[in-house]
Structure formats: C-alpha cells, structure tokens
C-alpha cells in the first residue's frame, strides 16, 4: 500500500512537471514573438494604423456622439476592409452621423451610403434598430458594459471589447478578430478552433497589460506580413521559431546578424512537501535570452 502511494505521488509530480514546462515554454514563445512583431511593426504603416475604427469618429463631437460614431464604425467593420469602412464612415459623417440622423434615414438611402461595406443591407437595418434602442433606453448614449453592448443588434464580443476600449477607455477583454485568431494559432501560442475560444485562451496566457495592445499589434501584422494567403515568411523575424513558417532556413539578401532578446517571466513551481498530500507553490523569476537571426541594413 505504501509503495503504491509513493508511485502515485511520483507520477503526479511528473505530470505536474511536464505541464509546468509546457506553460513555461508557451510564455517564453509569446513574449519572444511579441517583441519581434513589435520590432517589425515599427517599420510598418498598416491600414489599421490610419483607417482603423479608433481613427474614424469625429474627435470634436460631443462625447455621446463620439461614442456612437465609434460604435457605428465597429458595426460596419466586420467583413469589410479598413479602406472601405473609412470611406463609408466619411459619407455618413458628411450627412451628420448621430443617433437622430440615422433614425431620419430611410433604409434604402442608408444602404446607398453604406455600399459597398460587407453585408451593407443587413447593417443598415442593424444601425436603425440600434439607434432606436439607444434613444429609447440609453438616453442617446451607448451602453457602458460588455453585456449591454453585446445585446445590441449586430454587435459581437470583438466589437463590444473594442467599443469598451476606444469609447469608454476600459479594457475588459481581448478583442479577437480573424487576424488575432489566425496569428496566435500559427505561432503556436494556443490551439483553438474559434475566435471565442481564442479569446478565452489568450486571456489566460497573456497578462492583462497586453490585452488591449495585442489586437492592434496583430491586426497590423496580419494585414502587412502574416496574411491569410501567402504570408511573407521569408522576411518575417519569427520565421526561425514559428511552427507554421515556410521559410525557417531562408536567408535574406542582406547579411544576417544575431539579436538577443531578454524575456522576463515569472514561473510558478509546484512541488510535493515531505508531508503527504501537502503542496507548496513558490514563484521564481527567470530571465531567458533568446537569440534570433535578424537582417542588418547594408
């Protein structure tokens, strides 16, 4: 009986050790990749940087109007390129984009303004329904909670999280769109099948300080470098460690040099105490230096 108990403890410890190693490796991976992506993004001007939804509302409008415009921009953004969305928002603002103005439009006229936004006919209806709800139930403003925003027609979790961040200045979750979902899985940070599952997984993996910037960072990276089709793996700084890279051994025409990136992390160790069935957790800080091949300027 005693030996059997000992075997169980040893087996349990082994499983815990493997799990700890897996988590530690994933933490090192995403921290390394984020630093490399930030380095690449410094030289990129992506559509999201100049035409993202955070750029489309009138900064001089009254706060409730500004918040409504942020909401509208995000409602139009799904299945729509930033350039098309920005143009549609300009047309709406030229007509005076407010709750009252949206309610004055006839649906066919609103459709004409929104076209060629993706699903513009459906979104025209959503906009009018949302405007009526905001007028009747929110005194002409937008909800200030995630649940309240998600209850509006045509508003999902990604939009709601971005509205909270942009309009209310509050980050309550990670906004996961197709770029964030694709890239975080390509890099091997997580293994998920839907954006909703990706959000939950990333919110466990990433510290809250990264929840807001990760969307903008990965969206721009996905637009310019890690595209859905034919990603530019040959010039990506993550290509040597990315499990999805098609160019792990590809050298650029310029000379390669080495760059060391120090990744700081806290790792929680779990071990068995001498007393049976008593576990102790300790936190230790580690530093990992990762050498990544990058390209020097000629």
Curated annotation (Swiss-Prot):
Biased composition (Basic and acidic residues): 288-298
Segments of skewed composition (Basic residues): 278-287
GO MF term set: 4 iron, 4 sulfur cluster binding; 5-formyluracil DNA N-glycosylase activity; 5-hydroxymethyluracil DNA N-glycosylase activity; class I DNA-(apurinic or apyrimidinic site) endonuclease activity; DNA binding; DNA-(apurinic or apyrimidinic site) endonuclease activity; metal ion binding; oxidized pyrimidine nucleobase lesion DNA N-glycosylase activity
Keyword Lyase part of the UniProt annotation: yes
PROSITE patterns: ENDONUCLEASE_III_1, ENDONUCLEASE_III_2
GO biological processes: base-excision repair, AP site formation; cellular response to hydrogen peroxide; depyrimidination; DNA repair; nucleotide-excision repair
Annotated protein name in UniProt: Endonuclease III homolog
Organism: Caenorhabditis elegans
Gene name tied to this protein: nth-1
């Amino acid at each position: 009986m005693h030996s059997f108990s000992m075997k169980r403890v040893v087996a349990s410890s082994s499983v815990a050790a493997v799990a700890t190693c897996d988590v530690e490796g994933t933490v090192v991976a995403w921290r390394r990749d984020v630093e490399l992506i930030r380095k690449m993004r410094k030289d990129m001007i992506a559509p999201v940087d100049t035409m993202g939804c955070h750029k489309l509302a009138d900064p001089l409008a009254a706060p409730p109007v500004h918040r409504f415009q942020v909401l509208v921009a995000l409602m139009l953004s799904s299945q729509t390129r930033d350039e098309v969305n920005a143009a549609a928002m300009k047309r709406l603002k030229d007509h005076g984009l407010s709750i009252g103005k949206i309610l004055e439009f006839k649906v066919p006229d609103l459709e004409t303004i929104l076209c060629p936004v993706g699903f513009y006919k459906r979104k025209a209806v959503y906009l009018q329904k949302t405007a009526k709800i905001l007028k009747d139930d929110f005194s002409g403003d937008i909800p200030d909670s995630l649940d309240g925003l998600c209850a509006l027609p045509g508003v999902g979790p990604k939009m709601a999280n971005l509205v909270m961040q942009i309009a209310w200045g509050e980050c309550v979750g990670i906004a996961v769109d197709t770029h964030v979902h694709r890239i975080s899985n390509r890099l091997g940070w997580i293994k998920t099948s839907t954006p909703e599952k990706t959000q939950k997984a990333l919110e466990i993996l990433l510290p809250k300080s990264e929840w807001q910037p990760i969307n903008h960072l990965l969206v721009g990276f996905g637009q310019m470098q890690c595209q859905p089709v034919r990603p530019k793996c040959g010039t990506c700084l993550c290509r040597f460690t990315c499990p999805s890279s098609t160019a792990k051994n590809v050298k650029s025409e310029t000379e390669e040099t080495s760059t060391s990136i120090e990744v700081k992390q806290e790792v929680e160790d779990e071990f068995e105490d001498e007393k049976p069935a008593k576990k102790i957790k300790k936190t230790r800080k580690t530093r990992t230096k990762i050498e990544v091949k990058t390209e020097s300027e000629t």
